[in-house]
Amino acid sequence: MSGEPIRIDPISQPQAEAEDAALEVTEAQERQGEQMSAATIPTHGVMEGGGSYNLHARIPAGGGNLALPYLEDAARSLAVRPGTDPLVLADYGSSQGKNSMAPMRAAIRCLRSRVGNERAVMVVHVDQHANDFNTLFDVLHNDAERYSVDDPNVFPFAIGRSFYENVFPREQVDLGWCSYAAVWLRHIPALIPGHFASVACTGEVRAAFDLQAADDWRLFLSLRARELRVGGRLVVVFPGLSDEGATGFEPLFNSANEILGEMVDERVVGADERKRMVLGAYPRRRAQLLEPFGREDQFQSLSVEHCALFDLPDGAWTDYQLDGNVESLGSRHAAFFRAIFVPSLASAISDAGRRLAFADLLEQKLKRRLCERPAPFHSFVQTMVLAKQAPAVTPPARSSPSK
């Protein structure tokens, strides 16, 4: 073997201290740059194109569905501006759009009950410039569940920009939605010896990921606080961690990690390429999400209205228990891994033709391994609802009476 792969155990990981200023991340970037040069940083966080994510991202879809009541409540409780200006809904991290249809439809329905059918609603889908926007536009135009099918006053838009940058001018967004996207870090701070998943790292590497995650979360919140209107709401959905530090995907990640080691031994993947295969996904605990808000429960004019953790059932496992079709179970789990995680791993391979062959072979091997070891994904969903408050007004100082 080229190096014994490590396994992920659901053990508690220390929470790193976050820095005070959300946007002052230059020093952190310099420290992380010492661990991982720019030449070794793979791209990450872009899903597999051609509609693959839409077909196989049932777990993120299920997590988003659990949060729909919170989104509907946010749409009912946000402050609606008087007048006729369009209401703005922001879909941060839209990917290829399929998983955005139900949330946007639910939010629009709740807003329509408040403002009627004539007021314009702008829905802006935001994702990285390398996202498969062609599939997104096809969904918006042709999907039977598209949110604009019976509403001529709904206007979809798309922006190809990272949500770790300014996406909108100040105070333009009435309602924001971000589902399963903010789990991806802005930068990968370090290579992970023996594995590709951040939940497997320890020591200095763990500290680097903890620091990057704390900085990125504060940056994300600060940018959204600028973009939200006073009285607006932001709903954020994450793949969560249990109190024991488990993601629920440990069997899947460990199987894939073993296969990557075998592919190095078979010389399908180079040892240096394997070292650069890192996922920039970082699931967070509730305490890590709440840390920026402090004792006063506020950060950058944002306050926490809800923060809840849910268990997410594995639909593929439920079907397997009913029909006993282990081939279908393995196929669905392997296709899920490929659509969401393999593009990030494959970005460590420079040749496009080899990347496709790598993805095909990894999926085939992973399916066989998962069929040999059938197991459910016992994953978790963390949902937050944030409200934008008006800035506190400091009363003028009273002048001392003249003597």
Residue spans for each PLM region:
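N-terminal charged/capping segments associated with class I S-adenosyl-L-methionine
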Residues: 2-14, 18-156, 160-171, 184-201, ...
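Soluble or luminal CAZymes and related metallo-dependent hydrolases
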Residues: 66, 212-216, 281-285
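Short, conserved SAM-binding segment of the class I
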Residues: 171, 216-223, 227, 292
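Short SAM/SAH-binding signature in class I
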Residues: 171-180, 235, 380
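Mobile active-site "lid"/loop adjacent to the S-adenosyl-L-methionine
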Residues: 178-219, 238-275
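Substrate-binding/catalytic lobe of Class I Rossmann-like enzymes that use SAM or dcSAM, i.e.
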Residues: 230-350
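Core SAM-dependent methyltransferase catalytic element
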Residues: 379-401
